[in-house]
Amino acid sequence: MLELIGRIDYRLGVGALIVALIIVIIVWTIAYIEYRKLVRQRRIDWLVKRIKERAEDSGNESGGDTEELETMVDMGHLRLLDGNDL
């Protein structure tokens, strides 16, 4: 057992640490990207819900919220409220 440990070079340990560090960076980057997508989707869902509530209350939709939602989803004209259920 001691012979095996003696034959292992320190470069192997350093290489393993570097590979582990790279894997950790990749995994945390992917997790952060997915987290940002989730937060953005929640914000979009909240805005859609708010626009629908205002449309039901006042009979028309809120222009400010629609503009904010358009900028978030990078679209020109949203037709989220043009449904038969409203």
UniProtKB/Swiss-Prot annotation:
Entry's Gene Ontology BP terms: receptor catabolic process; symbiont-mediated suppression of host innate immune response; symbiont-mediated suppression of host type I interferon-mediated signaling pathway; symbiont-mediated-mediated suppression of host tetherin activity; viral release from host cell
Topology feature Extracellular, residues: 1-12
Regions that span the bilayer: 13-33
Description of activity control: Ion channel activity is inhibited by hexamethylene amiloride in vitro.
Positions where Phosphoserine occurs in the chain: S58, S62
Location, primary (coarse class): host cell
Cytoplasmic side: 34-86
Domain of life: Viruses
Keyword Transmembrane: yes
Membrane topology category: Single-pass type I membrane protein
UniProt record similarity statement: Belongs to the HIV-1 VPU protein family.
HAMAP family per the UniProt record, alphabetical: HIV_VPU
UniProt remark on domains: The N-terminus and transmembrane domains are required for self-oligomerization and proper virion budding, whereas the cytoplasmic domain is required for CD4 degradation. The cytoplasmic domain is composed of 2 amphipathic alpha helix that form a U-shape.
Additional information: HIV-1 lineages are divided in three main groups, M (for Major), O (for Outlier), and N (for New, or Non-M, Non-O). The vast majority of strains found worldwide belong to the group M. Group O seems to be endemic to and largely confined to Cameroon and neighboring countries in West Central Africa, where these viruses represent a small minority of HIV-1 strains. The group N is represented by a limited number of isolates from Cameroonian persons. The group M is further subdivided in 9 clades or subtypes (A to D, F to H, J and K).
Function of the molecule: Enhances virion budding, by targeting human CD4 and Tetherin/BST2 to proteasome degradation. Degradation of CD4 prevents any unwanted premature interactions between viral Env and its host receptor CD4 in the endoplasmic reticulum. Degradation of antiretroviral protein Tetherin/BST2 is important for virion budding, as BST2 tethers new viral particles to the host cell membrane. Mechanistically, Vpu bridges either CD4 or BST2 to BTRC, a substrate recognition subunit of the Skp1/Cullin/F-box protein E3 ubiquitin ligase, induces their ubiquitination and subsequent proteasomal degradation.
Name listed for the protein in its UniProt record: Protein Vpu
Organism expressing this protein natively: Human immunodeficiency virus type 1 group M subtype C (isolate 92BR025) (HIV-1)
Organism taxonomic ancestry: Viruses, Riboviria, Pararnavirae, Artverviricota, Revtraviricetes
